[in-house]
């Protein structure tokens, strides 16, 4: 395919793109060792900007990664594989030396359709495990909060009635004591549910980095039982969408603050005129990442539509290095999650 690719500053990334393709996200990921490179891509019928993250995995060996990009909506299904291969080939000369593969986490395109694309050519390979969730639930906010609540299922309505009598939700105002109290709850949740927790430094970076607060901001919503913090969620806001990223809560018999936290975030997203609330993370197509099934029941209780996307896909620049990296990566994924079946694997993103 004919395309023209130029390096640009990360500040020139399109503000209309998903937050994962923004200068804000490049700054966040810098705190976990990824360096952001921005590009403009011009084709015959479209043009877009692209964020590529690069991380050194070993001496002289780096992985390049495109989070939720490039856009595919204007392509025919038969063109997607060729487009991804051509983009990887042409962008290689603009990436640092030593990059052994380009990893795509493609955007969500399919509404309630589990027949997603996979790829297996000499150099383009769909992976057994994905970096980011392959399924999500999105709620249309365009008609306002009251209209959204009409779509809540009875499970959510019952849980909210109980939670409203026991908990209060407030926005974190930036004080360290409240953040640390929530982080303790987060660590307890990680131990209980068996996931790998993010560091305090990384989670702070989500809330501190915002070069233009009118475009991308994140908020920590805290749930209180009296004066005690018993839960909280981090939600990322942009002009087009709000995305639930991280959450934690203590367990109570017959009651949960998680429903009240999500309802508060949905209300806040409506007040900010976001078009979509993304609950971010349910099992993928055809039973992939089935360990997220419990989350699907919770997230779909707020209504919305499930969306699916293709699994993570790598373009191989150096096949020998890639095979070595994939072996150790698979071992790490399974050991961190105690996963025996490859179909249930989903690493911490």
Where are these regions (language model features)?
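Flexible glycine-rich active-site/ligand-binding loops centered on an Asp-His dyad
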Residues: 66
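A conserved beta-strand-loop-helix scaffold within acyl/acetyltransferase catalytic domains
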Residues: 2-60, 106-111, 120-254
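Acidic-and-aromatic substrate-binding clefts and catalytic sites of carbohydrate-active enzymes
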Residues: 74-77, 108-112, 285-291
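A short, internal acetyl-CoA/4′-phosphopantetheine-binding micro-motif in the GNAT/acyltransferase core
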Residues: 69-79, 142-143, 247-255, 283
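Non-catalytic accessory segments adjacent to catalytic cores
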Residues: 78-133
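Active-site/acyl-donor-binding loops of N-acyltransferases
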Residues: 2, 14, 27-28, 58, ...
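Short, high-confidence coil segments that cap the C-terminus of an alpha-helix
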Residues: 34-36, 96-99, 216, 271-274
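Aromatic (often tryptophan-rich) hydrophobic motifs at membrane interfaces
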Residues: 85-90, 206-319, 323
């Amino acid at each position: 395919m004919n395309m023209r690719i130029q390096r640009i500053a990360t500040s020139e990334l399109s503000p209309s793109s998903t937050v994962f393709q923004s200068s804000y996200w490049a700054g966040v990921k810098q705190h976990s060792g990824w360096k952001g490179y921005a590009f403009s891509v011009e084709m015959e019928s479209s043009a877009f900007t692209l964020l590529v993250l690069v991380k050194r995995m070993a001496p002289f060996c780096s992985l390049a990664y495109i989070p939720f990009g490039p856009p595919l909506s204007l392509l025919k299904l038969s063109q997607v594989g060729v487009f991804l291969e051509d983009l990887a080939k042409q962008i290689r000369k603009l990436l640092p030396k030593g990059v052994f593969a380009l990893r795509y986490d493609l955007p969500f395109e399919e509404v309630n359709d589990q027949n997603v694309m996979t790829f297996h050519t000499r150099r383009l390979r769909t992976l057994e495990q994905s970096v980011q969730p392959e399924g999500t639930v999105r709620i249309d906010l365009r008609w306002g909060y009251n209209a959204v609540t009409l779509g809540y299922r009875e499970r959510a309505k019952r849980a909210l009635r109980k939670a409203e009598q026991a908990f209060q939700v407030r926005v974190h105002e930036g004080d360290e004591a409240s953040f640390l109290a929530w982080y303790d709850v987060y660590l307890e949740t990680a131990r209980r549910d068996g996931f790998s927790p993010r560091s305090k430094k990384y989670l702070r970076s989500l809330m501190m980095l915002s070069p233009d607060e009118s475009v991308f901001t994140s908020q920590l919503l805290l749930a209180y039982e009296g004066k005690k913090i018993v839960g909280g969620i981090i939600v990322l806001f942009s002009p087009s969408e709000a995305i639930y990223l991280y959450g934690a809560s203590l367990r109570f018999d017959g009651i949960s603050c998680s429903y009240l936290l999500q309802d508060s975030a949905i209300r806040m997203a409506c007040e900010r005129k976001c078009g979509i609330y993304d609950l971010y993370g349910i099992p993928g197509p055809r039973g992939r990442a089935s360990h997220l099934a419990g989350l699907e029941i919770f997230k779909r209780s707020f209504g919305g539509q499930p969306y699916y996307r293709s699994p993570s896909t790598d373009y191989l620049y150096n096949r020998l290095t890639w095979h070595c990296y994939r072996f150790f990566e698979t071992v790490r994924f399974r050991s961190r999650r105690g996963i025996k079946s490859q179909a249930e694997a989903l690493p911490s993103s």
